[in-house]
Amino acid sequence: MAAPPPPPVLPDDVVEEILLRLPPDDPGCLFRASLVCKAWRSAVTHPHFRRRYIGLHRHRAPPVLGFLHDWEDERIPDFVPTTASPFSLPAPDRRFWRPLDCRHGRALFLYDRGQETQELLLWEPITGARQRIPVPSAFRCAWPTAAVFCAAHGCGHRDCAGGPFGVVFVFTLDISPNADVVTSACLYSSETGTWGKLNSREYEFSMDFEHHSSVLVGRSLLYFLSDGGMILEYNLGSGELAAFRPPPDDYGSDNHRFNLMLAEDGGLGVAEAIDFQLILWKREASDGTNARWVLSRIVDLDIDPCTLVPVLGFAEGANAIFVKTIGSLFMIELQSEQAKRVCHNHGFCNLIPVVSFYTPHSRLQVPRGEHQDPAPPLNLLRRGGQQGVWEKKSLELAQLLFDKGCKAINEKDFAHAADCFRHALEIRVRHYGGLAPECASTFYRYGGALLCKAREAANRSGNVSK
């Protein structure tokens, strides 16, 4: 009996309309689609597709793709996804680049190990573009921080990568043992390629910035939380600095259990976790000068009341925060108050959420030359001991699953093939990273198996309806 003819090929415009409706909160779908064939890859990597994709989802907030961190454990990838399916981004090697901030489609890193001068690295997670920014030697200190923001006038900040940006660098220096310490901030402009005027203020206390990232309120006010609990305000327009204290500790809080956030009205807020509750504060200024902290909302957390719950990060644009318990890391969407377990608690101290609409880019690999990391990625280094043995066995299992998936394809058992490729893909992405060449064939086979599985289901449905 002759085999049935293949189904007709869908027109390109119909394929594009289908791909446009893949869910933004599961970016792995678009990435896998880009590996199915050259036509699909050309469609989803075209700038026109990205504009339409973002426009189609203009009424929803951009999703949290994952987070960056500075925890020194080579078993944990530099970028940890929070999405449903396997997904990865080629983040800079955190052995050398400490993540500081992420905003408006750009992430900022600091390199300060064993050099006389520090250096910043700007990375666009979606395009993969990188740019190094030298930091003046006079700014060098132990624990500085920095913030990045889009500098394009009138930008809606939903797709502003590649445009002008600004960086604010904040640091503290002890002038002498008997004098106050000086906290300074300086603004860098990508349009001029230069640092601006240095603005400084003397305080009785030193400010180190290791465990918290910044928050941008409106278009002109940046806030930084020091490790000691003081909040530093920087005015982008005037360059003025101001420092003030966080909310009162009537609830028995401590500095390492709260973090900065945006309040419901768009102003400055603070989230802190006390026992099994999330306490949300906002800063109000009735006359523009005398500001005070006001309790905004209390969210009940469905966790053990004896568990320590530090607030690790706030996702600007997505209105979500990260908290950790003894065993797990959770992301809480503040509007719905829904909590989602992200991963195990690996001892993270600071998280930098990456918030953006994802579409595959034609330039996925890091270019060679000046934008390359100063050392090869962790997955290219030789590993020994128990960890090396475990990873070798995991990769052998991935190959076995891949071979079983190929055999299932030949036997037209597409459901089993998709399961095999999915498990193999999870192992290889965890080891190599989602954009590594070692994962490309698995992505391709997995996407093909899913398409065949869906086509088979559609054919069965058509036969039943007849």
What are these regions (language model features)?
Residues 385-399:
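TPR-adjacent "capping" and linker segments in tetratricopeptide-repeat scaffold/adaptor proteins
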